[in-house]
């Protein structure tokens, strides 16, 4: 079976209203793709900064701390060096990916053209969502600052949402939560070529 690759291109368009992301099985432009699956909220509410259940938040934070723990030694080895050398930062990031992928979940690097490991789970989640089947998938991102970003995509049969969590290291090399947020995905599309694009709900004027 020919191995596929998934690229993540994060385009945060804060011009007025939109925040968009693109995950693709290749680098093909998603425009004019056939057989797209588009989902738009029928009665969109604000859809951003949604409340997070405390038990769920604890679960997510604990998971992030566990992942940070398994890459701590790699970060300690590169700490300070990667800040001045982009190549070194990418080496660190790639080594982190190799460790994180062992849990079986999809993982990418924070550079725009990083290949996603364990892409099959993301692919299955999206195909199931096309069939309006409930499900979720976790995508980890190894960042060049030595931290991680965790994105949990969920589909309830009607709408898709994403819970994003970011952790970095303190000066004492302890994991620090910088943010956790839950937002609905206003619109998404998954094409036959493996391109996954979505637009998050964000504040709109006059908010």
Tell what function each PLM region has:
Residues 25-207:
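Mature, Sec-exported extracytoplasmic domains of Gram-positive
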Residues 15-18:
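C-terminal motif of bacterial Sec signal peptides marking the signal peptidase cleavage site
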Residues 1-5:
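Positively charged n-region of N-terminal signal peptides that target proteins for export
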Residues 7-9:
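Small-residue packing motifs within transmembrane alpha-helices
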Residues 20-22:
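Bacterial signal peptide processing site
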């Amino acid at each position: 079976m020919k191995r596929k690759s998934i690229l993540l291109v994060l385009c945060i368009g804060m011009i007025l209203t939109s925040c968009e992301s693109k995950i693709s099985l290749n680098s093909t432009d998603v425009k004019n793709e056939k057989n797209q699956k588009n989902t738009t909220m029928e009665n969109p509410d604000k859809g951003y900064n949604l409340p997070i259940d405390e038990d769920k938040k604890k679960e997510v934070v604990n998971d992030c701390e566990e992942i940070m723990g398994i890459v701590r030694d790699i970060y300690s080895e590169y700490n300070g060096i990667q800040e001045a050398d982009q190549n070194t930062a990418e080496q660190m990031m790639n080594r982190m990916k190799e460790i994180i992928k062992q849990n079986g979940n999809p993982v990418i690097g924070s550079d725009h053209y990083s290949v996603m490991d364990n892409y099959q789970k993301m692919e299955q989640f999206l195909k199931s969502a096309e069939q309006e089947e409930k499900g979720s998938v976790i995508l980890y991102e190894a960042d060049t600052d030595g931290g991680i970003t965790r994105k949990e995509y969920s589909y309830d049969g009607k709408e898709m949402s994403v819970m994003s969590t970011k952790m970095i290291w303190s000066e004492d090399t302890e994991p620090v939560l910088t943010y956790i947020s839950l937002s609905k995905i206003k619109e998404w599309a998954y094409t036959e070529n493996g391109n996954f694009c979505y637009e998050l709900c964000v504040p709109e004027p006059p908010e």
